[in-house]
Amino acid sequence: MAKVLVLYYSSWGHVEQMANAVAEGAREAGAEVAVKRVPELVPEEVARQFHYKLDQAAPIATVEELADYDAIIFGTPTRYGNMASQMKQFIDQTGGLWAKGALVGKVGSAFTSTASQHGGQETTLTSFHTVMFHHGMVVVGLPYSFAGQNGVEQVKGNSPYGATTIADGDGSRQPSQVELDGARFQGRHVAGIAAKLAG
């Protein structure tokens, strides 16, 4: 049984919803799944002023525990086409893991949210891919065998680089069914590959 970590940062809960959907998919594939988040860096009074979702149930991860999993699926909202600083700050502490080759051969994947359809989804996902390559991870996206990412009949996220959702500039749009389905598919897909690699 593959061990999968869904590690995310979420300001307003969109990525949290996607993380839970990713975890559902990985569990459906038979994986042992943990959902954890990285620490918030925004001062609490500022976070409250901007209505951040501060009641997220997922526990805070430690850098060292990343080595305990067969696959890590990262999630973050985009910040100007890149991962959020909270996630970057966490990842920047993985030098010790890199020095030991602790993540080499593990499966890595990512998902994100943006304010608009063209708000930097794919560049955010590829910012994770660069990190994964440096750690020697096996990078997995969201293949076109997930049919929900095809078509133009509705505004929707998802990309071959990973599952995505569109939140609108004020955060009013919640992840749609097809976006959550994409996240579940990605979780199943990653867990299946991790199980094969773990032997």
Swiss-Prot record:
Disulfide bond annotation, renumbered to this chain: none
Positions with a binding annotation for FMN: 10-15, 78-80, 113-119, 134
Kindly report, in one word, the top-level EC class recorded for this enzyme.
oxidoreductase
Positions with a binding annotation for substrate = 98
Where's the Flavodoxin-like domain?
Answer: 4-190
Q: Which reaction does it catalyse?
A: a quinone + NADH + H(+) = a quinol + NAD(+); a quinone + NADPH + H(+) = a quinol + NADP(+)
Instruction: Name the SUPFAM superfamilies for this protein.
Output: Flavoproteins
Q: Can you say what this protein is called?
A: NAD(P)H dehydrogenase (quinone)
| Family as reported in the entry's similarity comment | Belongs to the WrbA family.
Co-factor: note: Binds 1 FMN per monomer.
Q: What PANTHER family has UniProt attached to this entry?
A: FLAVODOXIN-RELATED PROTEIN WRBA-RELATED, FLAVOPROTEIN-LIKE PROTEIN YCP4-RELATED
Gene3D superfamilies for the chain: 3.40.50.360
Q: Where, in this chain's numbering, is NAD(+) bound? A: 12
Source organism superkingdom:
Bacteria
Q: What is its EC number?
A: 1.6.5.2
Q: Which cofactors are named for this entry?
A: FMN
Under the heading NCBIfam families, the entry gives: flav_wrbA (TIGR01755), PRK03767.1 (NF002999)
Name a Pfam family for this protein. Answer: FMN_red
Q: Which PROSITE patterns match?
A: FLAVODOXIN_LIKE (PS50902)
Q: What GO annotations for molecular function exist for this entry?
A: flavin adenine dinucleotide binding; FMN binding; NAD binding; NADH:ubiquinone reductase (non-electrogenic) activity; NADP binding; NADPH dehydrogenase (quinone) activity
**InterPro entries associated with the record:** Flavodoxin/NO_synth, Flavoprotein-like_sf, Flavoprotein_WrbA-like, FMN_Rdtase-like_dom, NQO
Q: Which UniProt keywords apply?
A: Flavoprotein, FMN, NAD, NADP, Nucleotide-binding, Oxidoreductase
